[in-house]
């Protein structure tokens, strides 16, 4: 049985993800208490459900039981994948204001921002259970596409995720490492290159003509190659490397694509995401 556990902050998109998984043929359960996960998994596996998605959030009692229960399920041979969704405070406040919904931890004595902060603290032990996705600048469609690719990945070795972004949109919350490449020559100032991206050959040619770009690439690649074995030895499922330029269109995209291609050739499991391009 393949089991996808969806957790994270309220308002970060868990309902969107669960609906997408349901439309993709998963048997879905919303807001299952964490303590009931082993019993639910046993019952569902006996019922010949091959693909199951379960949402668990702060409304669930005994969240602290979740990490241990996930380890037990993996030991029993169940393929478990965990998605942790989050967003920055400004985005969550805006979403709640637009929908006029009440935060599950809200009270007469706390503000919405305080409720969000309290929930983030409660969920802190779950952050590193699987793949973190910062949905702050993601459209619903982009989130669906990210999750679709995630659930098609088989459990096993660490997955290396390269994510380009624009600093003007904010640093993504889900990054393990952030590299700032704004010091590199900027194709934006060439009118012919401005509407293109770091995936286009003219932009690649422009960047490859500068030694500083090659040096930056070599340094980032060398850093990852040096420390990646340590993350693998630590049994990490994912390592997210974020590369940022000003707008997330040219330099960061080029380097993310080039690094992803290099590590694929080394036979690592690699995903690549372009936050600003997918937002636009």
From Swiss-Prot:
Tagged with keyword GTP-binding: yes
Domain of life of the source: Bacteria
GO-annotated molecular function: ATP binding; GTP binding
Matches recorded under InterPro entries: P-loop_NTPase, RapZ-like, RapZ-like_N, RapZ_C
Residues the record lists as binding ATP: 8-15
Keywords: ATP-binding, GTP-binding, Nucleotide-binding
Cysteines engaged in disulfide bonds, as pairs: none
Gene3D superfamilies per UniProt: P-loop containing nucleotide triphosphate hydrolases
Keyword set includes ATP-binding: yes
Binding site for GTP: 57-60
Protein family according to the UniProt entry: Belongs to the RapZ-like family.
Reported function: Displays ATPase and GTPase activities.
Protein name stated in the entry: Nucleotide-binding protein Mfla_0145
Organism: Methylobacillus flagellatus (strain ATCC 51484 / DSM 6875 / VKM B-1610 / KT)
